[in-house]
Amino acid sequence: MVRPLLDYPSRRRLDACINISDIRDAAKRRAHKMVFDYLDAGADDEITIRRNKDAYSQLELHYKILAGLSPPLDMSTRVMGRDVQIPFFTSPTAGSKMFHADGEVGVARAAASHGAMYSLSTMGTAAPAEVAAALPTHHPKLFQLYVWKDRSLVRDMLAQARENGFHALALTVDLTWYGNRERDSRNGFTVPPNYTLRQTYEALKRPAWTWDFLSKPEYAYAAVDLAAEGRTRRAREGVSGETRESDEAFPTVSFILFTYGQLD
């Protein structure tokens, strides 16, 4: 009962959205400031983000006339060896439960409802098994993988993806260290959050987001945590989140021979 009431203003704003800019504004009004900035920001002076926007603004879609097209139109194609209904797919995003309680599962269901392939981040807050359970059997799924120094961690995450029907792999090789995200530094962004006076004040200004955040299970990087549990059973020693995200993350990769192939 509480959540629908708190969400009512956000849903009204969302229903009134007619373009991507409107959706961004609606998200900014609903989400905690540090969470919105985490999603919206880039590194350093955010030059790349601005250039990306400028580059996309130069693209034009030229339609054909007198081409004999009539409803229903068919946009289906094949992406990474799988049939999809639309020619694009969701980008892997870390920490989706920060933005909404449904997190990766909610995004996966939305993608499936439009016949789009879904991609799950290594740093997702839902495990591959959770995502797979929320999707129709054999729905196209991609798993994004970071190259960790601990190869057993990588193997365990790949095993999770394979066992749960993820058919393709996106290998990230251009992230050898974390970007200098200045907005995150200014906001005091941490995972899990520090409940400072400033963060509490911002949370009170966003009751719908705050209710979502407090009513869901404890925030965790699910795939990484499950992989670490597997390694712990083998090594008989614990792995802290701090270690995973600093000492063991992102080695320098000078050469990788990567041939596209199916995980299944």
What are these regions (language model features)?
Residues 92-98:
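Glycine-rich phosphate/pyrophosphate-binding beta-alpha loops
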Residues 88-91, 116-120, 141-145, 169:
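Hydrophobic faces of well-ordered beta-strands that scaffold small-molecule active sites
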Residues 157-168, 172-175:
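Phosphate/diphosphate-binding loops
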Residues 1-81, 192-261:
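An N-cap/entry alpha-helix motif that binds or orients negatively charged groups
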Residues 32, 90, 111, 171:
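Conserved, mostly hydrophobic/aromatic
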Residues 99-104, 120-140, 148-156, 176-189, ...:
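Active-site-adjacent beta->alpha loops and helix N-cap segments on the catalytic face
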